[in-house]
């Protein structure tokens, strides 16, 4: 049973990580524009970016279109590792809980706690990569540094900037995946009831996976958005050192109270929701694509893993006397 548990967890983790990698790459230019737009905080009328599209046009007008992909390698690495850890932890904890209660059906509360625990493990282990990718994205176009240089610019403690908010934001994917999983189970149960028991297993269509992913992510994003923006500002690249000679300005304290005070003072209550539309667009598309791709390749991944296990078991039997 233990072997089956590990194999199924690895299958879930692998398919989830591949889905995350592909969705991250497809939507990366939008993510870069969104991050730079969120990171800027200035008094109304003095903003460099009034609209999200201003970031995109700046890249084009300055001849740095490829800079929309600055930090893509680090982001993909962080995305793949974090998704693998998350889906492995989520699947592993979920199956352990099922074994403990003797049922495969898990309630919403238990599912939420399991997802939050998986998210917390992921945040702690991948925070330096998350910080580095945010700094690269929010750097001036054409001036992004490499991964090692970005991480070693400050102390190693700076590599964990925003960890507190990251742990708080575990409620975001926890809500999303819980809602998605519950809706998915309901749809599959209805599909099984309509189909013949001897027929092939019912699977979620790509379109329905996309819709469920979008619905489950929207509510979580709206609720947690103020924390999301604060996190981006804490992790953003500090270009003020290079720009001090041109236009001196007081730096924002890279702490939760510091960024909250800065947003409140310069932008007011609505500042906590600056870039919300872009965040919803990006996160909904990203999550929906991730889950859609994951659902479509999970079966293939599981078959490959079973084939590999069968190969090793067969070799072991041939070697044994």
Swiss-Prot record:
Compartment list: Peroxisome membrane
Superkingdom: Eukaryota
Membrane topology of the entry: Multi-pass membrane protein
UniProt GO molecular function: ADP transmembrane transporter activity; antiporter activity; ATP transmembrane transporter activity
GO CC term, one of those recorded: peroxisome
Primary location: membrane
InterPro entries assigned to the protein according to its UniProt record, in alphabetical order: Mitochondrial_sb/sol_carrier (IPR018108), Mt_carrier_dom_sf (IPR023395), Peroxisomal_Ade_carrier (IPR045900)
UniProt-listed GO biological process terms: ADP transport; ATP transport; fatty acid beta-oxidation; indolebutyric acid metabolic process
Matches recorded under SUPFAM superfamilies: Mitochondrial carrier
Tissue spec: Expressed in stamens, pollen grains, seeds, leaves, cotyledons, roots, stems, flowers, hypocotyls and siliques.
The Solcar repeat ranges on this chain: 7-96, 106-186, 204-300
Alphabetized UniProt keyword annotations: Antiport, Membrane, Peroxisome, Repeat, Transmembrane, Transmembrane helix, Transport
TM stretches of this protein: 10-30, 106-126, 160-180, 203-223, 256-276, 288-308
One Pfam entry name: Mito_carr
Family the entry assigns: Belongs to the mitochondrial carrier (TC 2.A.29) family.
Function, in words: Peroxisomal adenine nucleotide transporter catalyzing the counterexchange of ATP with AMP. ATP is needed by reactions that generate acyl-CoA for peroxisomal fatty acid beta-oxidation during postgerminative growth. Required for the beta-oxidation reactions involved in auxin biosynthesis and for the conversion of seed-reserved triacylglycerols into sucrose that is necessary for growth before the onset of photosynthesis.
Full protein name: Peroxisomal adenine nucleotide carrier 2
Gene: PNC2
């Amino acid at each position: 049973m233990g072997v089956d548990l590990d194999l199924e967890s690895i299958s879930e983790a692998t398919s989830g990580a591949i889905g995350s990698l592909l969705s991250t790459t497809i939507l990366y230019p939008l993510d870069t524009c969104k991050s730079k737009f969120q990171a800027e905080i200035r008094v109304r009328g003095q903003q460099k970016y009034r609209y999200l599209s201003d970031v995109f046009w700046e890249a084009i007008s300055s001849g740095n279109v490829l800079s929309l992909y600055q930090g893509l390698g680090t982001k993909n690495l962080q995305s793949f590792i974090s998704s693998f850890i998350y889906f492995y932890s989520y699947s592993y904890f979920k199956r352990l809980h099922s074994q403990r209660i003797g049922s495969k059906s898990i309630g919403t509360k238990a599912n939420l706690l399991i997802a939050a625990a998986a998210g917390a493990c992921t945040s702690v282990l991948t925070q330096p990569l998350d910080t580095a990718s945010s700094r690269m994205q929010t750097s001036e176009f054409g001036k992004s540094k490499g991964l090692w240089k970005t991480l070693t610019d400050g102390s190693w403690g700076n590599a964990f900037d925003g960890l507190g908010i990251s742990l708080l934001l575990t409620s975001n994917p926890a809500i999303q995946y819980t809602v998605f999983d519950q809706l998915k189970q309901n749809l599959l149960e209805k599909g099984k009831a309509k189909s013949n028991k001897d027929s092939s297993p019912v699977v979620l269509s790509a379109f329905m996976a996309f819709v469920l992913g979008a619905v489950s992510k929207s509510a979580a994003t709206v609720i947690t958005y103020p924390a999301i923006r604060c996190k981006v500002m804490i992790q953003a690249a500090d270009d003020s050192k290079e720009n001090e000679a041109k236009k001196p300005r007081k730096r924002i304290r890279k702490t939760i109270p510091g960024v909250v005070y800065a947003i409140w003072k310069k932008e007011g209550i609505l500042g906590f929701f600056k870039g919300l539309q872009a965040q919803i667009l990006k996160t909904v598309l990203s999550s929906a694509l991730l889950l859609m791709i994951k659902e479509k390749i999970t079966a293939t991944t599981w078959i490959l893993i079973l084939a590999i296990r069968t190969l090793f078991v067969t070799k072991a039997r041939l070697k044994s006397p």
